Amino acid sequence: MRLWKSMAWGILLWHSQSGALCPAWPPARAAEEIARLQQQLADWNDIYWKQGVSAVDDSVYDQLSARLVQWQRCVGQDVSSTPVSPPLNGTTMHPVAHTGVRKLVDRQAVEQWMRGRSELWVQPKVDGVAVTLVYQNGKLTRAISRGNGLQGEDWTPKIRLIPSIPQTTQGALANAVLQGEIFLQREGHIQQRMGGMNARSKVAGMLMRQDNASALNSLGIFIWAWPDGPANMPERLSQLAKAGFSLTNKYTLAVKDASEVERARQSWLTSALPFVTDGVVIRMAKEPASQHWRPGQGDWLAAWKYPPVAQVAQVSAIQFSVGKSGKITVVASLVPVILDDKRVQRVNIGSVKRWEAWDIAPGDQILVSLAGQGIPRLDEVVWRSRERSKPVPPDSHFNSLTCFYASATCQEQFISRLIWLGSRSALGLDGMGEASWRALHQTHRFEHIFSWLTLTSAQIANTPGFAKGKSEQIWRQFNLARRQPFTRWIMAMDIPLTQAALQASGDRSWEQLLMRTEQHWRQLPATGERRAGRVIDWRNNLQIKALSRWLAAQHIPGFGS
């Protein structure tokens, strides 16, 4: 594991074993943040297992637990004390230990794990609470919570009240130990669409509370292990089904390679199931004798979990952008996370007022998901760093009539105006994105939003970062823009009208536009009194008038005499 490495000024640069970045904290702060997160997880853990109440979403808890382990590894700290398993309240020994399951991160890891292993089967990874069922002489005699894998709580009285769990067995199952998952029964649950629903916490809550016997009717059981059971998997599944554990037989499939595992995984993700799942488990039919089972040592099975629909991401910086209308937007830069195969490294928070209400600072952990069209969305702040160092937002004097001309304070809104005028809604300058505009402005120091019209082909070619092909394309685009109709140039100047309203107005020259009264603008489509007033203010703005004269001097259609 990698240790924090001090630099001369006491700031630490960082990497973790997994390739994820570690926080650039001094040692004292690192120790404090780790201790705070560790205590918070312990508190949530305690509430969850003692009261059956979830103070935080299951997925958030799991991801923050993983984040804690990452931080601990960054500083070379022992991770064995991480509170990711229930506190040991029960003292009932498991006749066979719960091994837990190793997590595989992707298909490549699945292929590697399967290599050299035979007689493999795949099952859905049912999301619930693990339990041991002990049958003696054909009767259910004990039910034990997973606990720490070696011992847990005696849940027998509660388990006897769950109708879906057989109370009697016969044949080979008359004297048997079974391990499985108590889950919340669902009708037609489609995991991809409906998500996890905090199912694990709901099941734990039902089993912990004393006043909800009727709620136990909604619980089911999925048996995933029969220690020392039949070596032949089909025989094992058949006997379980005959005993009343039919789901195991229905949802256990033989697989030969990672492709078949992936097919089953995708099918169960998108199909209607009777339970919530969070991935699949691949297991060998051949298992060691039960006396050799130990927590954390089940190398004959592994899990390939579904990617979470929302990811906990660390805020690395807070940035402000000013749109062409002067609206200030706050953006959180993130340590990159993957959501639905999309690399997410920034999320729009919204207005300064909304950012202040969220109280987000660098170092905070936020929950991010994808909204419509794959746009990252801020869902909640799940953990706040102790240090609340926030940048100061820019002055709020910007509006829809500022920054047509460049200045030190107008940098961001000026760039936003360039991006707008190059869009298809205005002049349609193909290939001109934010990076290109910034490069041109930084190199040639535009005076106003149309200064690029005077650039020569040599000047464009000498712009840093512009290859020959790109320079020639931009030169052609700039020259073609001169032929664009008057209405396109007016849109580029951000007249507060829709394209439909501007077309309906019939104006084809600046002179015509100057003659229009406010009453004329009010009668146009989607243009009421307020917008008509804004058009008059725009037309009378000194910067707009200056730009119209400049465009006339450039012989742009509609601006000359």
Swiss-Prot record:
Catalyzes the formation of phosphodiester linkages between 5'-phosphoryl and 3'-hydroxyl groups in double-stranded DNA using NAD as a coenzyme and as the energy source for the reaction. Keywords: DNA damage, DNA repair, DNA replication, Ligase, NAD. SMART domains: LIGANc. It comes from Salmonella typhimurium (strain LT2 / SGSC1412 / ATCC 700720). This is DNA ligase B. The lineage of its organism: Bacteria, Pseudomonadati, Pseudomonadota, Gammaproteobacteria, Enterobacterales. It catalyses: NAD(+) + (deoxyribonucleotide)n-3'-hydroxyl + 5'-phospho-(deoxyribonucleotide)m = (deoxyribonucleotide)n+m + AMP + beta-nicotinamide D-nucleotide. The active site is at residue 125. HAMAP family: DNA_ligase_B.
